[in-house]
């Protein structure tokens, strides 16, 4: 709602209700035979059904979930309750507008004290960060004060119903932190300014998905290019709450692309020293020169992307671009350049097409292992040892993400591309070499830059080199 400028709750007596485009959308959404929505909206509708609230979608007889590899992340987001500084300010403002100025002032003071209790010792944090919640005596006292005020606010006369609901939700969330409820993963999310958001993630996402979507017994089809990790669907089945369902029908469509002829997989020669940013920049320069530009360089970290990009400055004559978050305009400029070099991270790992020769060199700087956070810390504790956790969770997630990034290389049957993975752990003889190869289609590999040059000469037309 907040992303489309719709209030958290719409009063039933709103005089614009009949003309409101959002309300009209809700009415129209009950009419069509085929309904299209994103994952979050689907899960919100499922939540409404379980709670006997008004439906967001018409009752359906079949469900098709595209890009289903993203559904677990959407579910984690939907099943995580949060209370941010903005939410706190909004509650105080709503109380003030309801003519409870003194009460709003008390609540604002209590919220500030609670936030302060979570920001002590933050000098070591750099940028955004998440930390597991620890219930200190200071935080306990601050939580008790906030909960008491929220509870008292719920008993005030003439408070609008939607505000009562918001106050009740905030009280319930803070109680989770006070009681340290074991079915919730409690952590503090700090923004770039160090302001804390209280987050309570569910530790039962697969079970919640099972109740929300699969126990309806309606037929469901889940599609994606990366549902399987190294050809195995079991990890995705576990994340989606489908592991207990039998029989499940699996179908794998072979790629129409001739990777053995049209793709060359390059690993840098193995050396004893670790590849730091300077050595990585030198390797990127060699590859870009060998392929005459036409390069996409994918990073897992925006910070590393910026540092390596700076080290390559002035090392080639090809137009060079750097895509930050929301970098659609920069990506379009790269596509129009013809032979440019694009440094990118984040969303460029998937969902963006680079057909033709514009990406004839795909460089993957690091294997895309998931970034540790309080939720992954909780998951790790569910395994008897670290090795079992890495094999069961971390490697399959890396393989699916690696396959998504690899998919930027060849988008049509006429495309050809060199894919270079610079992470020494993925190289020949590296710790994760076999895991990386298992995630990718079979194609020839090399450690020689001369093979890269020859591949480009054989695959590309003369106008490619102009």
Where are these regions (language model features)?
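ASCE RecA-like P-loop NTPase motor cores
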Residues: 1-466
């Amino acid at each position: 709602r907040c992303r489309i400028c719709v209030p958290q709750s719409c009063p039933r007596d709103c005089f614009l209700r009949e003309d409101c485009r959002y309300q009209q959308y809700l009415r129209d959404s009950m009419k069509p035979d085929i309904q299209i929505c994103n994952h979050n909206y689907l899960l919100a509708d499922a939540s409404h059904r379980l709670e006997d609230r008004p439906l967001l979608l018409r009752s359906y007889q079949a469900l098709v979930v595209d890009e289903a590899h993203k559904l677990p992340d959407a579910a984690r987001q939907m099943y995580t309750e949060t209370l941010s500084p903005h939410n706190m300010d909004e509650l105080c403002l709503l109380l003030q507008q309801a003519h409870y100025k003194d009460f709003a002032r008390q609540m604002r003071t209590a919220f500030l004290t609670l936030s302060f209790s979570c920001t002590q010792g933050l000098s070591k944090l750099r940028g955004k960060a998440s930390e597991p919640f620890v219930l200190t005596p200071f935080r306990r006292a601050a939580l008790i004060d906030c909960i008491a005020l929220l509870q008292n606010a719920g008993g005030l006369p003439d408070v609008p119903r939607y505000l009562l609901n918001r106050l009740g939700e905030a009280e319930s969330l803070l109680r989770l932190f006070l009681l340290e409820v074991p079915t919730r993963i409690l952590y503090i999310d700090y923004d770039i300014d160090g302001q804390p958001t209280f987050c309570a993630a569910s530790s039962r996402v697969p079970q919640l998905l099972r109740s929300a979507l699969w126990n309806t017994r309606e037929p469901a089809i889940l599609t994606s290019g990366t549902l399987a990790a190294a050809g195995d669907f079991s990890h995705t089945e576990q994340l989606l709450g489908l592991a207990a369902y039998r029989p499940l029908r699996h179908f794998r469509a072979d790629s129409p692309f001739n990777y053995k002829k049209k793709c060359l997989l390059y690993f840098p020669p193995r050396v004893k020293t670790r590849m730091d940013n300077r050595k990585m920049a030198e390797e990127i320069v060699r590859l870009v020169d060998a392929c005459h530009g036409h390069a996409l360089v994918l990073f897992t970290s925006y910070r590393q992307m910026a540092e390596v990009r700076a080290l390559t400055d002035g090392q080639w004559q090809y137009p060079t671009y750097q895509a930050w978050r929301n970098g659609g305009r920069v990506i379009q400029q790269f596509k129009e350049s013809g032979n440019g070099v694009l440094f990118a991270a984040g969303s460029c790992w998937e969902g963006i097409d680079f057909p033709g020769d514009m990406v004839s060199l795909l460089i993957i700087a690091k294997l895309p292992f998931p970034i540790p956070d309080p939720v992954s810390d909780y998951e790790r504790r569910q395994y008897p040892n670290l090795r079992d956790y890495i094999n069961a969770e971390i490697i399959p997630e890396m393989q699916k993400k690696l396959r998504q990034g690899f998919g930027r290389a060849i988008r049509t049957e006429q495309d050809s591309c060199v894919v270079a993975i610079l992470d020494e752990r993925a190289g020949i003889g590296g710790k994760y070499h076999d895991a990386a190869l298992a995630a990718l289609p079979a194609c020839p590999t090399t450690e020689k830059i001369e093979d890269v040059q020859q591949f480009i000469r054989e695959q590309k037309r003369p106008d490619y080199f102009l």
